[in-house]
Swiss-Prot record:
Gene: smpB
Protein name (database record): SsrA-binding protein
Cellular location(s): Cytoplasm
Main location: cytoplasm
Basic and acidic residues compositional bias, start-end: 129-141
A UniProt-annotated Pfam family: SmpB
A GO molecular function held by the record: RNA binding
Length: 151
């Protein structure tokens, strides 16, 4: 069960406090799947939003597939995310009531070859929270160096 990660949002865990994660399918066109397989997608500035009872991925970048001609896709188009009705209801209530956001963490191909997205329900970190997590990361790094040196 090897998942091939093709795009990752590395700053998400630094900028947001991750509350819960979900696996969502993505509605893609054929050229978008081929472009994803090349591994040049970018989801760093993207987010997901609830519109009309559906969850949509906004501002993600999948470059045009160069071998396709006139049937190519729009690189920054909105893409529908596939979740169960119960998950959509839970996400909608959390977004509307508690002021949380939906952040994509990574896009990958599962063992059946389907494009999936790991979506996080998150709350934005304040500046002092970011500093605190940076201090903690530095301390863990120093600790591992000391243990390795005196090991």
């Amino acid at each position: 069960m090897v998942n091939k990660v093709v795009a990752e949002n590395r700053k998400a865990r630094f900028n947001y406090e991750i509350i819960d994660t979900y696996e969502a399918g993505i509605v893609l066109m054929g050229t978008e799947v081929k472009s994803l397989r090349e591994g040049k997608a970018n989801i760093a500035e993207s987010y997901a939003s609830d519109e009309g009872g559906e969850i949509w991925l906004i501002n993600s970048y999948l470059p045009e597939y160069l071998q396709a001609n006139r049937f190519n896709h729009e690189p920054r188009r909105r893409r529908k995310l596939l979740l169960s009705g119960r998950e959509i209801h839970r996400l909608r209530s959390a977004i509307n009531r508690e002021g949380m956001t939906l952040i994509p963490l990574k896009i990958y191909f599962n063992d059946r070859g389907r494009a999936k997205m790991e979506l996080a329900l998150a709350k934005g970190k304040k500046l002092h929270d970011k500093r605190e997590s940076e201090k903690e990361r530095d301390w863990n790094r120093q600790k591992s160096r000391l243990l390795k040196a005196h090991g």
